[in-house]
């Protein structure tokens, strides 16, 4: 058996592996003859084998060619072994592994065969080599026995080893029998292949190899079949291989081996006869490689395999390498190993291509292929294509191949001599090395075997010996390759094996030794290769129980030269290690394959690194010592152990150098990330821990981060000290947000701090999510994360002391919530279009990337001063897969923006949830406040139901499936009244809002559809003028909250009264139809006429904040009674110190107002007079608005501080005037009473004072600090004053106000929100719009209310007084309007509660505005509508509800209480729901 094995092995090595094809070998030629023929005709046999492969499957050849790249890649991973023809080598390696397991002598023979190969007289040399190989096989078997396991055990392992991990002794006998069977089958196959090529038959003749392989093949067969199935080109070879294996282990292996051999590119290249056949073999080899698991099994299967493998596998590493079954046999028998070596060149060449794929393997194969090439050029010709790819991809490998060739030639000579001598007698060094390599390899594999037992047999065998390391490399590569490309791998291995066998016989032997040494060294620290080899050997024994191979240890000393080469191995192992992961049996086989293939690919450093890396990867318990796994990687790198054999030390070094170049190659795979192959990807990681890996890692990581535009700087490497912290701008779920400036660039950034102190689980999941998602989102409407920095100078400090790190974002000046709540800005319809367009574009982008934001709200929508919108805060975002049905949490999205399906418990939601949130924001942009404000889920659903209708199966069929449908039903069924409530917004916007707030998520429009809506489709952002945002103040949520708290604490109290008044209005609106219904009450604006006084108060919101209700009342009385009120008087009344500028402005205003008053007396068109007035007062500031607006400009003329006060007063006066008429305006300016109706203009005036009229109104007023409250004038005074004012206003003003109210268009949205709101509330009331939050206000009205909140707050008393005076004295439309006015005021006072107020909009004097407008409308005849308007205003002017309430309640109650008790109750109702009651009017 050993002999047949050897024959088979030799045949594999020379004929089977080499591909020496002796057609005359016939199935039944004597093994020795055939072996000789094979040896001599190894190349021919290869070519014939290739032809046979072609015969077997023309597809195989073509596929081999086609699959070549893949195979090459796989081979590259295995190529790194040592052969330029990695494919052949890999198949050969596998075979060699088997052979190694079978015989070290086989290995020696292979080496000799390699020498012969190098001698271009392959036939003669191979014949002699065959004889020598036969002898060597015998001696090799003895060697194996000496090594500590007989060839038989190797054979047995080969036979059953891959399939089962049997004891070496039992396996030896088995392998003998199997070898005989295999030999017969091989012979039969060869005779069958005879037609194709005698060389094939000769290959068959060495059935002993195949026999040995047959078990291996059996084990391989599944893989090979698998591989074959994977790669069709292998299908012939693979099929025959698999079939043979399946049919009869012996024969199948033989035939398979033979087929593999035939197919093996090695045989083809040796044959040199056919490049296509070579390709076929390549495919086959790929297949074989696929079966690499088999070779692995074999390796791991038998200790003898290990021992023999040590020398054989080194020489037979080629066979091991070649995926072909015979390749395994090679591993089993020395001869096969040798031929495998000669074949190897072809394999190597394929491997070279493969190398290009996998740097580690590439390197190995290139150096090995060099040796092989010198041995067998003919094969190379066929392999040439593979080589070229290898060369092109691995130029270093070419040089290394040349060196290897030279070394192989030298080794071949030595091998020839050694071969002639008994394998044991081989030059002691070489022989010893081979032996030692085999033994050591066996040791490791044995240990691995023991651990891995049957399943890991392949892997174990691979690891069995350093020689086996070659096989392991082959196997690992094969496995990896199998994983990557099963058939191509086989072919590559077969080719590589064949090619390398003749040329690399010596190389194989040397490689075995080297592999042994390097493996040993690799196993321990690769660095200590020369001296450490024994240590590694010792270490491997722990891995591999067989320490017996002490001779290998001496060999290792002989191999000291090898250790230096081994470091390259070590480096190569890294590559192998990478490959390893992909291999089916990663532990053992991977280790060895890593070791073998990687040395070539990676330099010693790399090898060392890879060894270290490999160790972690190698899970084999048999490889307990860390060094051992590296060794295996080294072996794998040495997968072309031929290179690593005793002669190969120098070659190995050369390979190492080349591998260094190959090391560079691994970098390319890095870029893809795992593109070359899973091994490659792992390789970078494995290498990463070591020196080279680090280099690779940065390259990998940087590009990754570069995806996030961070290519320039590595994330996490900078310290937060690089930034100057300017201030805190927000608070998030896991830290604060700071405004900062980059010290280097001067760029403003936002730093989001993430604390790790209190994190039980380390890094906060929300931060991880945000980082991960933001790196994938690059869009102009999505906030850009620039980098990540830490608060430590050194990353090591971060580990010691858990600090914080910061996400660095581009800085945005404002967020939408801060702007809306500030009242500093009024957005026009164009601005809203621009904002919504950008918002929906960003959301559509996220949804198309399959991300749900799940937290869209105003505070997460950022703006800069140029009007650019960005979506921020992706801490709750997640990847959305429409196909997966897994549930998500429904506790997402802030309650006010949460869609009904989440409120009802839906857990399988869609991107429609984000569209609902954006619909809420669209409504909020028009109403200036959240449209659904509740603090409980049930209450939120109630608010949604009131506006959008109750969820029911009629409109939402799937609602009945939701978990909480029955438990959270609204108290009553509501019909959908969204269109009525929002009738004041443009129809296109209303349509869009209607679609976005559809209850049924399946019918709700998508983000993409919103962009195609009439409202947004024609929006051109580039042509949009940026909104006039406050550049002096960054409006963020945190700032807004602080401001709100301040108002509530003291400033707000005064501010609140106006808010209360406005709230009253809002409340009344709410009462009518809680906030939402209030809009239908628009008729109430008539009372607003009488209430213009309150309107004025709202205009005076800021001043009102400063003044008491009584003071406001006095001021209103004064203003009303005295048309020629001097600024000093006003200042005194208000207890305000006015600067000269303010006084001048006020005087100018008064004059203009008086003029206007006269004009208004003459003309009922307050509009015309108002423009005059505005021109007179503040032409520059005046905006082209209705009279009220113009008045506002006047107010705006006033300086900032006094401006605010004057603006409040003037806005009140002007508002009153505008609504009332020119005369009324004059009266209003001088008298608060008349101003009540004109309150809208007054408010604008205040705005103008604080800021440009448009922007200033509400927002600037809030900034205005409330002055000392003026002495409260007695209510009677107010009444008297009011009477005087009404007298002035009576006919003309009333008419003007009525006209204004009836003609809301008179107040263009353009004018300040106050004016707008005052008039518009009336308009809307008249229209019976459901102006909820805005209530009466149109878009402008809402803006007005927002702006007026402060005015309202500051002048609630004034407004009420004005309204009262106006009502009483004016007798506008009659006592009804008078009463209506009082009522609305009364209601305002009583209804508004600071708690109910929305502080965000307290400044907005909507209520006042609505009141102002309402008195007129009320005159027209709807006290209810007045109340509604008030309610709306109240909601908006929550800030000053308290003050307004007190003032208005006191004053208003006196004369307004009796008038309309109805208004009050209405307001009460409205007031209670101002927030939640009105869907739109809910205070923020």
From Swiss-Prot:
GO cellular component, one term: nuclear speck
SUPFAM superfamilies linked to this entry: Protein kinase-like (PK-like)
Modified residues (Phosphotyrosine): 73
Alphabetic keyword roster: ATP-binding, Isopeptide bond, Kinase, mRNA processing, mRNA splicing, Nucleotide-binding, Nucleus, Phosphoprotein, Serine/threonine-protein kinase, Transferase, Ubl conjugation
Region described as Disordered: 1-462, 485-603, 616-699, 1046-1101, 1156-1199, 1218-1356, 1437-1484
Pro residues composition bias: residue spans: 524-570, 666-681, 1264-1277
Entry EC no(s): 2.7.11.22, 2.7.11.23
Any one GO molecular function term: cyclin binding
Catalytic activity entry: [DNA-directed RNA polymerase] + ATP = phospho-[DNA-directed RNA polymerase] + ADP + H(+); L-seryl-[protein] + ATP = O-phospho-L-seryl-[protein] + ADP + H(+); L-threonyl-[protein] + ATP = O-phospho-L-threonyl-[protein] + ADP + H(+)
Record: active site: 855
PTM comment text: Phosphorylation at Thr-889 increases kinase activity.
Biased composition (Polar residues): 251-275, 576-603, 1156-1167, 1189-1199, 1325-1336, 1444-1454
Protein name as it appears in the record: Cyclin-dependent kinase 12
Name of the gene encoding the protein in the UniProt record: Cdk12
């Amino acid at each position: 058996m050993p002999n047949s094995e050897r024959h088979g092995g030799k045949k594999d090595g020379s004929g089977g592996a080499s591909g020496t094809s002796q057609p005359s070998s016939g199935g039944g030629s004597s093994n020795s003859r055939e072996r000789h023929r094979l040896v001599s005709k190894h190349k021919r046999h290869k070519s014939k084998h290739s032809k046979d492969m072609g015969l077997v499957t023309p597809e195989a050849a073509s596929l081999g060619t086609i699959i070549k790249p893949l195979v090459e890649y796989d081979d590259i991973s295995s190529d790194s072994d040592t052969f330029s023809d990695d494919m052949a080598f890999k198949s050969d390696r596998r075979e060699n592994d088997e052979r190694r397991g079978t015989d070290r002598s086989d290995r020696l023979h292979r080496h000799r065969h390699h020498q012969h190969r190098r001698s271009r007289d392959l036939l003669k040399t191979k014949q002699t080599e065959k004889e020598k190989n036969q002898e060597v096989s015998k001696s090799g078997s003895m060697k194996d026995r000496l090594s500590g396991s007989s060839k038989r055990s190797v054979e047995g392992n080969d036979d059953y080893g891959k399939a089962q991990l049997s004891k070496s002794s039992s396996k030896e006998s088995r392998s003998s029998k199997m070898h005989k069977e295999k030999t017969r089958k091989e012979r039969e196959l060869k005779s069958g292949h005879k037609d194709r090529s005698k060389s094939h038959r000769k290959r068959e003749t060495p059935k002993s190899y195949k026999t040995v392989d047959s078990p291996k093949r059996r084990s391989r067969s599944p893989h090979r079949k698998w591989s074959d199935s994977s790669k069709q080109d292998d299908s012939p070879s693979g099929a025959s291989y698999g079939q043979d294996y399946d049919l009869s282990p012996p024969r199948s292996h033989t035939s398979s081996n033979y087929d593999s051999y035939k197919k093996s590119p090695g045989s083809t290249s040796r044959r040199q006869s056919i490049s296509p056949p070579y390709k076929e073999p390549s495919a086959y080899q790929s297949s074989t490689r696929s079966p690499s698991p088999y070779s692995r099994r074999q390796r791991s299967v038998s200790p003898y395999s290990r021992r023999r493998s040590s020398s054989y596998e080194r020489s037979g590493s080629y066979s091991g390498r070649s995926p072909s079954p015979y390749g395994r046999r090679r591993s089993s028998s020395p001869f096969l190993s040798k031929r495998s070596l000669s074949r190897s060149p072809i394999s190597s060449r394929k491997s070279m291509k493969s190398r290009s794929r996998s740097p580690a393997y590439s390197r190995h194969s290139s150096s090995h292929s060099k040796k092989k090439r010198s041995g067998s050029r003919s094969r190379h010709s066929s392999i040439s294509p593979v080589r070229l790819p290898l060369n092109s991809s691995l130029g270093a490998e070419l040089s290394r191949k040349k060196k290897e060739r030279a070394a192989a030639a030298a080794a071949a000579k030595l091998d020839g001599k050694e071969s002639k001598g008994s394998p044991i007698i081989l030059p002691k060094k070489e022989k010893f090395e081979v032996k030692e390599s085999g033994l050591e390899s066996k040791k490791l594999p044995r240990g691995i075997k023991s651990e891995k037992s049957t399943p890991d047999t392949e892997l174990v065998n691979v690891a069995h010996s350093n020689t086996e390391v070659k096989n392991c490399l082959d196997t690992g590569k094969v496995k990896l390759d199998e994983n990557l490309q099963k058939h191509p791998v086989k072919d590559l291995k077969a080719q590589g094996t064949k090619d390398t066998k003749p040329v690399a016989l010596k190389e194989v032997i040397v490689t075995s030794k080297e592999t042994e040494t390097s493996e040993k060294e690799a196993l321990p620290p690769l660095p200590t290769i020369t001296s450490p080899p024994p240590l590694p050997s010792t270490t491997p024994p722990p891995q591999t129980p067989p320490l017996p191979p002490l001779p290998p240890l001496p060999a290792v000393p002989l191999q000291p030269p090898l250790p230096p080469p081994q470091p390259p191995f070590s480096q190569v192992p890294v590559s192998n290690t990478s490959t390893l992961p992909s291999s089916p049996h990663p532990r053992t086989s991977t280790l060895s394959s890593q070791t073998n293939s990687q040395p070539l690919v990676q330099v010693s450093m790399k090898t060392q690194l890879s060894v270290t890396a490999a160790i972690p990867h190698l899970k084999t318990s048999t490889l307990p010592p860390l060094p051992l796994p590296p060794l295996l990687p080294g072996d794998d790198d040495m997968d072309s152990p031929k290179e690593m054999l005793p002669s190969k030390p120098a070659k190995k070094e050369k390979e190492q150098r080349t591998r260094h170049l190959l090391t560079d190659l691994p970098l390319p795979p890095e870029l893809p990330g795992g593109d070359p192959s899973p091994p490659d990807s792992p390789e970078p990681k494995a290498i990463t821990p070591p020196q080279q890996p680090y280099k690779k890692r940065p390259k990998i990581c940087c590009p990754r981060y570069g995806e996030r535009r961070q290519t320039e700087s590595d994330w996490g490497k900078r310290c937060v000290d690089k930034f100057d912290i300017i201030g805190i701008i927000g608070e998030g779920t896991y830290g604060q947000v700071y405004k900062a400036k980059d010290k280097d660039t001067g760029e403003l950034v936002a730093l989001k701090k993430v604390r790790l102190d209190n994190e039980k689980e380390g890094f906060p999941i929300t931060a991880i999510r945000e980082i991960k998602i933001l790196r994938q989102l690059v869009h102009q409407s999505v906030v850009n994360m620039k980098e990540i920095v830490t608060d430590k100078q050194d990353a090591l400090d971060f580990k010691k002391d858990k600090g914080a790190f910061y996400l660095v974002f581009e800085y945005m000046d404002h967020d939408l919530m801060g702007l809306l709540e500030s009242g500093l800005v009024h957005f026009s319809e164009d601005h809203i279009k621009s904002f919504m367009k950008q918002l929906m574009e960003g959301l559509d982008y996220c949804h198309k990337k399959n991300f749900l934001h799940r937290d869209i709200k105003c505070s997460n929508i950022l703006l800069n001063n140029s009007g650019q919108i960005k979506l921020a805060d992706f801490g709750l975002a997640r990847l959305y897969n429409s196909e997966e049905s897994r549930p998500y949490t429904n506790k997402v999205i802030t309650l006010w923006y949460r869609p009904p399906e989440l409120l009802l418990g839906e857990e399988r939601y869609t991107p429609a949830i984000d569209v609902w949130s954006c619909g809420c924001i669209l409504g909020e942009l028009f109403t200036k406040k959240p449209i659904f404000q509740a603090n409980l889920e049930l209450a939120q659903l109630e608010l949604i139901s009131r506006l959008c209708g109750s969820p029911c199966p009629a409109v939402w069929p799937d609602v009945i499936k939701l978990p909480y449908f029955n438990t959270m039903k609204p108290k009553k069924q509501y019909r959908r009244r969204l269109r009525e409530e929002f009738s004041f917004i443009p129809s296109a916007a209303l349509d869009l809002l209607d679609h976005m707030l559809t209850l049924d998520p399946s019918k709700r429009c998508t983000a993409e559809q919103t962009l195609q809506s009439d409202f947004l489709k024609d929006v051109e952002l580039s042509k949009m003028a940026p909104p006039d945002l406050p550049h002096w103040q960054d409006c963020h949520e945190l700032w807004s909250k602080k401001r709100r708290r301040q108002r509530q604490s003291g400033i707000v109290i005064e501010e609140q009264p106006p808010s209360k008044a406005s709230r009253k209005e809002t409340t009344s609106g709410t009462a009518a139809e809680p906030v939402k219904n209030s809009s239908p009450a628009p008729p109430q604006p008539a009372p607003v006429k009488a209430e213009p006084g309150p309107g004025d108060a709202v205009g005076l919101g800021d001043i009102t904040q400063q003044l008491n209700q009584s003071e406001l009342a006095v001021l209103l009385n004064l203003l009303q009674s005295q048309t020629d009120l001097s600024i000093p008087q006003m200042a005194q009344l208000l207890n305000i110190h006015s600067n000269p500028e303010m006084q001048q402005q006020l005087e100018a205003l008064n004059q203009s107002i008086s003029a206007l008053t006269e004009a208004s007396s003459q003309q009922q068109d307050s509009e015309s007079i108002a423009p005059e007035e505005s021109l007179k007062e503040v032409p520059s500031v005046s905006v082209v608005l209705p009279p009220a607006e113009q008045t506002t400009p006047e107010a705006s003329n006033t300086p900032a501080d006094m401006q605010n006060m004057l603006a409040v007063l003037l806005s009140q006066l002007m508002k009153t005037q505008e609504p009332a008429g020119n005369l009324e305006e004059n009266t209003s300016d001088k008298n608060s009473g008349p101003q009540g109706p004109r309150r809208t203009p007054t408010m604008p005036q205040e705005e103008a004072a604080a800021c440009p009229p448009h922007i200033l109104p509400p927002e600037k007023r809030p900034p205005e600090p409330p002055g000392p409250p003026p002495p409260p004038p007695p209510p009677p005074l107010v009444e008297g004053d009011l009477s005087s004012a009404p007298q002035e206003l009576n006919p003309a003003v009333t008419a003007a106000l009525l006209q204004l109210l009836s003609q809301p268009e008179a107040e263009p949205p353009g004018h300040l929100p106050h004016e707008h709101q005052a008039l518009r509330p009336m308009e809307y009331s008249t229209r019976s719009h459901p102006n909820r939050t805005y209530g009466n206000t149109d878009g402008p009205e809402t803006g007005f209310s927002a702006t007026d909140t402060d005015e309202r707050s500051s002048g609630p008393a004034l407004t009420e007084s004005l309204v009262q005076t106006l009502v009483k004295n004016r007798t506008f439309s009659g006592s009804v309007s008078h009463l209506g006015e009082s009522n609305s005021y009364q209601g305002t006072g009583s209804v508004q509660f600071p708690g109910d107020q929305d502080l965000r909009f307290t400044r907005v004097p909507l209520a006042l505005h609505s009141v102002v407008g309402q008195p007129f409308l009320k005159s027209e005849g709807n006290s209810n509508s007045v109340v509604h308007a008030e309610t709306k205003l109240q909601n908006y002017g929550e800030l000053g509800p308290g003050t307004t309430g007190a003032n208005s309640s006191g004053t208003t109650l006196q004369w307004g209480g009796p008038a309309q008790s109805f208004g009050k109750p209405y307001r009460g109702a409205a007031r209670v729901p101002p927030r939640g009651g009105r869907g739109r009017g809910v205070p923020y």
